[in-house]
Regions:
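ABC ATPase "signature
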Residues: 222-223
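A short, flexible loop at the N-terminus of ABC-type nucleotide-binding domains that lies
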Residues: 2-9, 15-30
């Protein structure tokens, strides 16, 4: 991990307005933070805290009401930056009649990747996400976990420097969640910068180097997970653990 910032956010505010231009919802309020090169950074907060809005602002899908964003050395409004970004939305909107190979080839074409490189990247990514056995099955036959994995492979087809993951473990069973976390750790090992958002502390605790806690569109805490858990903060962390007897009973 380097101290070089890949993302710089300064006083970012996003206000949604109604048809008449009246203030309806303030999704973000004066958010300021940096994401360092090579780290896995987590945005943690409940639904409606501003996590997905932040993701969309980074991608340039939304425009801020106030504030500035620099991403990979360019403003968020510069679409050329997207060539170096991979994005996994909370719901993977993929063509269900295509198989895994066809899906990755299709998205590779959108990035103008050559046929030879598309084939190589497709094979590498299918192996990376563990879908060799299902590479020629239509996506409509995939489980939720398999769909998330091919969605991650799609996000990596352009070999991005920055990967944005919106609720990557959403809807996954414990085994699927562990597989996704392993893949995120693999991305860190390869030098990728990852920003993921989640409403689950366990998700960010297992993989993130640092986290930002959002609530009501405002930044409440920022730092390493272990430091935030040890120190006294305004934000309270409530965790629960099942005892061995309870686990045995569930089994």
């Amino acid at each position: 991990m380097s101290d070089e910032p890949v993302i710089q956010i300064r006083n970012l505010t996003k206000t949604y307005r109604d048809f008449w231009g009246r203030k309806k919802v303030q999704a973000l309020n004066s958010l300021t933070l940096d994401v360092k090169k090579g780290e896995v950074f987590g945005l943690l907060g409940p639904n409606g805290s501003g996590k997905t809005t932040t993701m969309k602002l980074l991608l340039g899908l939304l425009f801020p009401t106030e504030g500035e964003i620099s991403i990979l050395g360019k403003p968020a409004s510069d679409v050329s930056k997207n060539e170096r970004i991979g994005y996994l939305p909370e719901e993977s909107y993929l063509y269900r009649f295509l198989n895994a190979e066809e899906t990755l080839d299709f998205y590779g074409r959108l990035f103008d990747i050559t046929a030879e490189e598309r084939k190589q990247r497709t094979n590498e990514l299918i192996e990376m996400v563990g879908l060799q056995h299902a590479r020629r099955r239509q996506l409509k036959e995939y489980s939720k976990g398999m769909t998330r994995r091919i969605g991650l492979a799609q996000a990596l087809i352009n070999n991005p420097d920055l990967v944005l993951l919106d609720e990557p473990t959403s809807g996954l069973d414990p085994e699927g969640s562990q597989d996704m976390k392993r893949l995120i750790n693999d991305l860190r090992d390869k030098g990728k910068t990852v920003v993921m958002c989640s409403h689950l502390l366990a998700d960010v605790q297992d993989v993130c180097d640092r986290i930002a806690i959002l609530y009501g569109g405002e930044l409440k805490e920022l730092g390493r997970v272990e430091d935030l858990l040890k120190e006294q903060h305004e934000t309270q962390f409530v965790t629960s653990h099942l005892g061995d007897e309870a686990v045995d009973e569930i089994k």
